[in-house]
C-alpha cells in the first residue's frame, strides 16, 4: 500500500539543531554533520545564493552541511548507499584535494585551528607518503597547500577538470593485478585500530628503517597496510586492491630529502601567508557559494 507524504515525514529521521537531539546513535558525535548520502535539504536552504563550494571533490559536502546544519536535514530511513571501502585504494590525486580543501574548510569554519596544527597534519601526509614509497602523494600534499595559498580568485578561475588531469600526469605507470585481492576482517580491524602504530618507537626513529641497512627481500604494501609493515625494505610491490593495479617502488634517499624540503617550505609559507589567505576566503565566501559563479564556470568550460 502506498504511504502518504505525511506518513513518510513522520517516519523519517529529522535532525534539526544538535541541542534538542536525543537519538542515541548520534550521542557519541561532537558535532552533527553528514555527506550528501541518504539525506535531504529543504529547498529553502538550497538557494542560488547558498550552493556548495566549487571544490571538484572532497569536503564540499561536509562544508555545506556545517554551513547549514542549524536549518536541519532529513535522513531517509531505509535508503542505503553501497560504496567501495575507502581503505582499499591508495590516495593518489586525492592527497591534493585532502590538503587543499581541508585548508579552505579551516579558513572558513575553524578559526581556532593554529598554523602549527596545520603544519603537523600536512607534514604527516607528506612523511607517510614517503614511508609508503608513494612519492607522488608527498608532492600532491605539498601542492595542495601551495594552491590553497593562491587564494579564492585562483580557485574561481581554475578549470577543475583540466587541473585534475594535470595532477594525474604525475601518477606512475601501473599494470593490472593477476589475482583479485580483498582485505580480510582481521586486516580491516587492524586498519581502523587507532593503536595500530603504537609500540613502533624503533621503526619511527629510524624512519621505518631508511637509516638502517636495507632488507633486499621484496615487500608488499596494500592501501590498508600500515607503512611499518615494510620496515627496512629496499623494494616493494604496491598493490592497489580497489583499482586492481600494481607497481614496483624503490627506496630513494633523495625522496627523503625532498620530503624534508616540502615540510620546511610548508612551515615557512603557513607562518607568513596563511593569515592573508584566510581573510581572502572569508571576504569572497558569499561569491564562492553563489550560483552565478557556477554558471560562469559552466559557460567557460563549454567555451
Where are these regions (language model features)?
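Extended catalytic-interface subdomain
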Residues: 1-47, 54, 98-107, 125-138, ...
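Short hydrophobic/aromatic-rich motifs at helix boundaries and adjacent loops
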Residues: 18, 34, 74-76, 114-117
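Residue-level signal for well-ordered alpha-helical segments
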Residues: 22-23, 42, 79, 115-118, ...
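Donor nucleotide-sugar recognition loop
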Residues: 33-38, 48-66, 71-81
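Short, contiguous acidic/charged loop-to-helix segments that flank catalytic cores in large enzymes
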Residues: 52-56, 89-94
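C-terminal, active-site-flanking charged/polar segments
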Residues: 64-73, 89, 97-102, 144-147
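Active-site donor/metal-binding and catalytic loop motifs
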Residues: 76-92
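Terminal low-complexity segments of carbohydrate-biosynthetic enzymes
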Residues: 101-303
Amino acid at each position: 500500500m502506498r504511504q502518504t507524504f505525511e506518513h513518510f515525514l513522520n517516519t523519517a529521521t529529522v535532525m534539526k539543531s544538535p541541542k534538542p537531539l536525543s537519538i542515541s546513535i548520534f550521542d557519541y558525535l561532537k558535532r552533527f554533520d553528514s555527506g550528501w548520502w541518504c539525506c535531504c535539504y529543504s529547498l529553502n536552504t538550497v538557494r542560488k545564493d547558498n550552493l556548495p563550494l566549487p571544490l571538484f571533490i572532497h569536503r564540499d559536502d561536509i562544508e555545506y552541511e556545517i554551513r547549514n546544519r542549524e536549518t536541519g536535514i532529513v535522513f531517509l530511513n531505509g535508503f542505503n548507499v553501497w560504496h567501495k571501502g575507502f581503505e582499499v585504494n591508495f590516495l593518489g590525486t586525492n592527497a591534493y584535494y585532502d590538503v587543499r580543501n581541508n585548508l579552505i574548510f579551516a579558513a572558513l569554519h575553524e578559526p581556532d585551528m593554529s598554523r602549527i596544527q596545520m603544519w603537523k597534519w600536512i607534514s604527516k601526509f607528506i612523511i607517510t607518503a614517503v614511508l609508503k614509497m608513494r612519492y607522488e602523494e608527498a608532492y600532491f600534499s605539498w601542492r595542495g597547500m601551495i594552491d590553497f595559498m593562491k587564494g579564492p580568485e585562483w580557485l574561481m578561475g581554475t578549470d577543475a577538470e583540466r587541473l585534475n588531469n594535470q595532477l594525474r600526469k604525475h601518477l606512475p605507470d601501473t599494470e593490472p593485478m593477476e589475482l583479485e585481492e580483498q582485505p580480510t576482517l582481521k586486516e580491516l580491524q587492524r586498519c581502523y585500530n587507532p593503536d595500530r602504530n603504537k609500540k613502533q618507537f624503533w621503526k619511527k626513529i629510524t624512519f621505518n628503517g631508511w637509516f638502517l641497512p636495507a632488507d633486499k627481500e621484496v615487500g608488499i604494501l596494500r592501501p590498508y597496510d600500515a607503512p611499518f609493515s615494510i620496515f627496512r625494505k629496499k623494494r616493494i610491490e604496491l598493490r592497489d586492491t580497489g583499482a586492481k593495479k600494481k607497481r614496483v617502488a624503490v627506496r630513494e634517499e633523495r625522496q627523503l630529502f625532498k620530503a624534508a624540503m616540502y615540510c620546511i617550505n610548508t612551515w615557512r609559507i603557513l607562518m607568513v601567508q596563511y593569515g592573508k589567505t584566510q581573510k581572502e576566503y572569508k571576504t569572497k565566501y558569499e561569491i564562492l557559494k553563489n550560483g552565478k559563479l557556477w554558471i560562469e564556470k559552466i559557460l567557460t568550460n563549454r567555451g
